[in-house]
Each structure stands twice: as structure tokens, then as C-alpha cells.
């Protein structure tokens, strides 16, 4: 499968309709461009935000004029503008009927049906299992089971939705998922990689429903993974937990229930041990600075707050990292073609520049080796600096997080996908892949197919040449999605600022932080 072309809808333009004399014209909304005369359309009025198709009018009077393809809403409604951004950047906002038809046939399959079983799928439905996700999540692609062993060790099961059981190579839905590469999450909306019948239903690990999964089983002694095994499985989640509820259980303000309460306690201890080991290895430690937004029913953004990273977030993070590392190590050892998540080591000068910048701002820094730093030494220095920075920010009530975090990120190279295992410097991992989110990332689906071919013999391994071509394609789709998500965040923040200025007056004083410096 070669890299597919851009979405057919990418040529459509987003504009605002305006009246210019006797003509109805489309004024480009996001970027400068020529105004286009538009054929009249009863679906849209002057001032509306619309998608137009240039020069597609067919009647004699309107020949050569643009036509309204879709009315999006109003330019003074945040949700409408974010929707417009997604379309302007080429997102389809839906699936072709042929893809939807293919998916309807897939979701009608019973999870226990022979067509979904594959070779040696283990029945784990009696095992206490739970999910932990954001309160607003709709697609649940990972679940956890855990148990304490008599010898003091622990056994962890990380169950990941078996998307590969439904989405077969070169099927219509597979081609469309590859074209998209990833789901795109913006405030109040999502452009899913898979149709919602799969992402929110058949593949989603909702409680009380049988679901096919791929399981990574790990025996963990302290902070060391003693052994691991991999197999297809069938689970039934007992509880859908969210981060807030888990944090309440951890701080004692809420109670856990059985059958999942004991498993959660074991998982908490295991995750803490794995996290402590990562810290000792100088893994980069940075909390997210992404904002979260609230909307009213009309689509107006009403509130914004920075996303908080808590112990419950870190629990899932550490367990997913462990599973990803184990899968990557197995695939590398067996030389199965797959996509690795690689993060090449930073340069010594970049590490030294970061240390100098942090020190000039009064932030504690780690010792730096004398002379020129090797890439590994640079990675160790930046990782240690990030951990000291996180503690310093926490002691200052979170002030300066966004600007200081950006300094660390700029000192690092950008992570990407590669068919070669080049290691993951930020995590200090010798082998790493993305395996735990196949509902929303295509590279994870590639890893699933590689893994089940290696351990279960279910289908051929991905073709090595095709995997090599998929690496730059999926990396580009990820960067594109991040650009759209950041643009949507900026739009929502602008609406919040506009609302406060309107309600409180333009003479208001706002507190802020310097997050960067540009030349004069």
C-alpha cells in the first residue's frame, strides 16, 4: 500500500458570506485569498461561515461562480469556528458510505464468534478488569488487571483492544484508517481514525461487554519486569473508572469496590515502582501544559483550565510504557517488521544551552560532564534537568510551567516513527513502540499485526518495504494532527479572552507568563 493522496475535500475553502453590492461573495476566513462570487443558496445567509466549492455552479446565470457546499454556522461561535478549521485543514468529518457499510458488517459479529477468535485466544472474562480514562472519553482501548503473587512479586495484564481482529489489511476501513493515520482531538470534537461504530462500540472496552483484546502479561518483581508473554484474549471489563475518581480513591475520599479494588491497589504499587526506576534512569519528566475547555449547548466556550497530571494519569502512563517496551523488545528480537517509536539522543550543545538557560532563571540544574558531552550524556543531563524542573515548578505553585517546559522540549529532537529501532532517548528505552492505542493511532495497529503474527501465527507479518514507507507517512499525519489541535486550542482561548474583555471591559488587567522571547 503506497501513501494515499490527500483528502479530496482538501481543496474546499472555508469562507464567510458577505454582500458586495448586488453580489454575494465568499471572504476567505483563515488565510488571505481572492474573494469569490457565490451563487445564491437558501441554506446560508450573509454572515454565515460556509464551505464553498470554487467555480462549480452549472446554471447559465451562475456559470463559473462558487457554490455553497455546507453551512458550518456563525463565526462568533467557538465550536463552529473549530469545525471550520478542521475542514479547512482537509479533515473529512465523516466516512464514505462504502466504508460505513463494511463496518456495519463487522460490528454485527459477536465478540465470541469464530471469525474473531484467531489462534489460541484466551478467555479472561472472569479476571477482575478495569479501565481508567478521562471522564469525557468515548473510546476505551486499554484495560488493566493485576494480582499479587505469593512470592511478593506482582502479575500485570495490560489488555489492548484487538482492532486487528476487525480491521483487516487492505480492507476499505483499513485503507481509510491508514490515510488518516491518527485521530484528531480538538476542543469539543474529534475526527476519529476509525468509524465510531468501531472506535466507540465494537472495539471499545466498555464495562460489562465481551471484547476481543491483545494482552501483555508481565511478572514484575519490585521495579523489574521478570518475564512477559503475549496473546490474544477475550475480556469483560468490570468497571469504567475515570482519572478523577481514581485520584479520590487514592486520597481516601472515595472507596474502591470489588472485584477490581484489590487489582487497582496492586497496579498502583507496580506503577509507582516502575516510575521510580524511570526517574533513576534520567527519563525526561514533563507534565502536560495542554488546556481543557468547557462549552455550553450553543457551542460557546465557557471555561478553560490547564490539564492536570495526577497520580492516576501516571499510573496508566507507566503501565502503558512498560507494555510498549515489552512488545518492541519481542518484535526486535524476532526481527518482525514493525514501526518503532524512536527519539534520537539530543546534541551536547543543546543540553548545555538548556542548563545555561535554566540556571539563568534560578532553576536548579544537575551537574554537567566536563568537555564535550556524548549524546547519551546529553540525554542524561536533560532528563535529570527535567525532573529537577518539575519539582521546582511544583514548589512554586505551577508558575512558569509552560515557558520552562518549552525550553526542555526545544532541547530535544522530535520523536517519530521508523522501521528501524533507534531507541527512545526521552524514555531512556532501548526498544520502544506504540502498541497501546490502536483505536486512534495507525502505527499501533501495525504493531498489533506484527505481534499476533509473531506469537499466534495469525496472518502474515507486515511487509518490510511497506512498513518502511508507512513510517514517514504516519509521522507526517501525527505532526499534521498536532498542528490542527494546537490551532483549535488557540481559537478556543481567543474566544475566552474575547468573552472576558466584553464582560469586564478592555481596561482589565490579566496575569500571564512569558513563554518565549522573539527578536525585536
Predicted features along the sequence, with ranges:
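Exposed alpha-helical structural elements
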Residues: 67, 81, 98, 102, ...
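Feature marking long nucleic-acid-engaging regions of large polymerase/nuclease enzymes
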Residues: 34-36, 133-366, 417, 422-459
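Charged, low-complexity, helix-prone segments enriched in Lys/Glu/Asp/Gln
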Residues: 3-5, 78, 82-85, 102-107, ...
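Short, charge-rich amphipathic segments
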Residues: 91, 95-96, 104-110, 203-208, ...
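A short, sequence-level motif marking secondary-structure junctions
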Residues: 40-44, 70-73, 231-237, 308-311, ...
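Residue-level "edge-of-site" marker
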Residues: 99, 344, 371-372
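Structured C-terminal cores of nucleic-acid metabolism proteins
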Residues: 326, 348, 358-520
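Charge-lined substrate channels and their catalytic hotspots, especially those that engage the 3′ end
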Residues: 1-157, 164-210, 240-241, 245, ...
